[in-house]
A protein has these predicted regions:
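C-terminal ends of transmembrane helices
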Residues: 1-5, 46-59, 109-119
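Interfacial loop-to-transmembrane junctions
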Residues: 111-133
C-alpha cells in the first residue's frame, strides 16, 4: 500500500491506518486513563483525515481534519466506557470501535468524494450507508444475544 501515491491508495492507507491504530490503542486502553485515550483517538482521527484531504487537494484541510478528529475522539470516549471486543486468537482481541470507526470512515470518504465530484449524494451514499447499517445491526444483535444469553 505505502509505495502507491494515487488518491485511491492514499484513502486505503488512511483507512487501514485508522483501523489498526484504533485497534492497538484500545488493546492498551486498560493501562491509561480515558483522557489519554481520547487524545490518542483525536490525533489519529486528525492525521487520517489530513491524509485523505491531502489526497483530494482540499484548499483548507485543517478544519475538516479537526472535525473528523473530534468525531473519532467522541467515538473513542464512548467506547472506552463500553469496550467490546471479538476474539481473533486467544491473545488477540478486535475492538468493536475499530470496526465502527472504519465503517464511519468509509461513509465519510464516500460523502466527501461525492461532494468533490459534484455527484448526487443519494446515489453515492446509498450502498455504503446500507452496508454500514447492516454490519452495525449484526454487531448489535450479536452483542445483545450474548448479553441476554439467547445463543450459546
Amino acid at each position: 500500500l505505502k509505495p502507491r501515491s494515487s488518491r485511491k491508495y492514499m484513502v486505503i492507507q488512511a483507512g487501514v491506518s485508522l483501523f489498526f491504530v484504533i485497534t492497538s490503542l484500545f488493546s492498551a486502553a486498560h493501562l491509561v486513563v480515558s483522557s489519554w485515550l481520547v487524545i490518542g483517538c483525536f490525533v489519529i482521527g486528525y492525521l487520517v483525515a489530513r491524509h485523505v484531504f491531502t489526497a483530494y487537494e482540499e484548499d483548507d484541510p485543517t478544519f475538516l481534519s479537526i472535525v473528523w478528529g473530534f468525531l473519532i475522539a467522541e467515538l473513542g470516549w464512548a467506547s472506552y466506557h463500553w469496550v467490546m471486543a471479538y476474539d481473533i486468537t486467544p491473545t488477540l482481541l478486535l475492538p468493536m470501535v475499530s470496526i465502527i470507526a472504519a465503517l464511519f470512515g468509509f461513509v465519510g470518504v464516500r460523502f466527501f468524494d461525492a461532494k468533490f465530484h459534484d455527484e448526487p449524494l443519494r446515489k453515492r451514499l446509498q450502498a455504503p450507508v446500507l452496508f454500514t447499517i447492516a454490519v452495525l445491526a449484526v454487531l448489535l444483535i450479536r452483542e445483545l444475544s450474548v448479553l441476554f444469553n439467547y445463543t450459546s
